Amino acid sequence: MTMLKINDLCVNYGMLEAVKNVSMELPEGKVISLLGANGSGKSTILKTISGLKDSRQGEIFFGDTKINGMEIDKIVDLGISLIPEGRRLFPYMSVLQNLNLGAYLQSSKAEIDKVRAEVYEHFPMLKKRANVRSSKLSGGEQELLSVARGLMSRPRMLLMDEPCQGLSPIMVKEIRKTIRALNERGLTILLVEHNVSIALGVADHVYILRNGSIVFEGSPSELSTEEFTKKIYLAG
């Protein structure tokens, strides 16, 4: 079953075409990696799906619902959660306070407490450090907090923008483990990456974006790491 479908998507920044006639289908319950160099349009696609950026052309469907032009909170309410690049935490707020900001769609304190308890099952370290300022966490811990905050809206799909950027090999391994664990619990994940080994290590399906256009779609097993890298950076 297809969870998200993109048809002929075009997105501009002024006169610059950032995304050019992109079509994608994301099956439910899978991890899909969107690979590309910096500036290839990967993050723009995530922003457009999540309502942060308007499209010039094309359609985006979440299930049977067209979400182009929909308000951000309505997109979140449908079940889409964006984990932005750079974490975007509030440094002077505690872990607990940052988490609660992700629960603004929940109707009561009891509901927030219930969802937070579910999230803590995935991230017991965050429960132990609930009253610590997020600025006191390591980069990897901050990334885990960013993911945890995204889960507070009880999404069906996670959009993850470069979650391993700037992290140590140990924390990269932890993030990859987290992605797989969340997927095994039923979450569909669209992972944006420029690092081939990270993307292929968790993906069920891969798209490669170059200069705003899809140049490859297929299984991680279809090409070697070297061949994937060439497709990202070299035309032809």
Can you say where each PLM-predicted feature lies in the sequence?
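Helix-to-loop junction immediately C-terminal to a conserved catalytic motif
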Residues: 50
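Catalytic Walker B motif of ABC-type/P-loop ATPase nucleotide-binding domains
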Residues: 158-162
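Conserved ABC transporter NBD signature motif
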Residues: 58-67, 78, 111-116
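ABC ATPase C-loop
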Residues: 150-151
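Conserved ABC ATPase signature
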Residues: 133-137, 141
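The feature captures the beta-strand-to-loop junction immediately N-terminal to the Walker
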Residues: 35-37
